[in-house]
Amino acid sequence: PKVSPRWPPIPP
């Protein structure tokens, strides 16, 4: 399965 990146990205 294709994993979608988180958007907006969460800062560390």
Swiss-Prot record:
Keyword Acyltransferase: no
Disulfide bonds: none
PTM sites of type N6-methyllysine: 2
Free-text tissue specificity from the UniProt record: Expressed by the venom gland.
Maturation and modification: Occurs in two forms. In form 1384.7 Da venom vasodilator peptide Lys-2 is methylated. In form 1370.6 Da venom vasodilator peptide Lys-2 is not methylated.
One GO MF term attached to the UniProt entry: toxin activity
Localization: Secreted
The entry's keywords: Methylation, Secreted, Toxin
Name assigned to this protein: 1370.6 Da venom vasodilator peptide
Species of origin: Bothrops moojeni
